[in-house]
């Protein structure tokens, strides 16, 4: 069950726009990659699954107390990630208090982020999420689990998660590049069907966060 902090947040925002955020981390990685992705996902979700999310996402640092204002925080990039001790403590408290962190590897982040996740949640394993998990079931069905958006190495797409007391608190999407699929159509020139898959999966993630 979500802790009191987030319960109060949801109660006070009922009927009003909620806000989600992009994580501005240290280490040299391009946390600012895919600038149009979150705004496009928000617009798509507001139009198709009746969310009421503010169109412009916030930007928040891992150690900031403002982190607790956002039920959903997104993180992406191509390279190095470093969480300081203060970052780790605040992020850990955020997740234990009911927050949700989605990390989308924009290709090149994997070797760095896995180490930081282990430091962040040393007592909880990062495990692969099966295709029958609810996050792949509604409102859009993905029978085979996470969709493939960009090829990169040609590996299969995988969704990993950290569960605490049976609640998914951290989602790590790997070898899919959802964020690229959320970008404006002319950024990567993805076929409309591929971009639609990415947006639908993103909508599923938001739906899961706001309803669990």
Describe each model-derived feature in a short phrase:
Residues 20, 72-111:
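Short alpha-beta junction capping motif
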Residues 63, 154-170:
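Short, surface-exposed beta-strand/loop micro-motifs that present aromatic residues
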Residues 16-72, 78-79, 177-178, 184-212:
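Aromatic-Pro/Gly-enriched surface loop or interdomain linker
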Residues 18, 68-71, 96-100, 124, ...:
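Loop/turn elements at helix/coil->beta-strand transitions in domains of secreted/extracellular proteins
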Residues 25-29, 78-82, 100, 106-111, ...:
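Solvent-exposed loop/turn segments at secondary-structure junctions
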Residues 116-146:
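Acidic, glycine-rich loop-and-strand cores that form catalytic or ligand-binding grooves
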Residues 3-13:
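Sec-dependent N-terminal signal peptides
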Residues 37, 41, 87-90, 109-117, ...:
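Stable alpha-helical elements in mature extracytoplasmic
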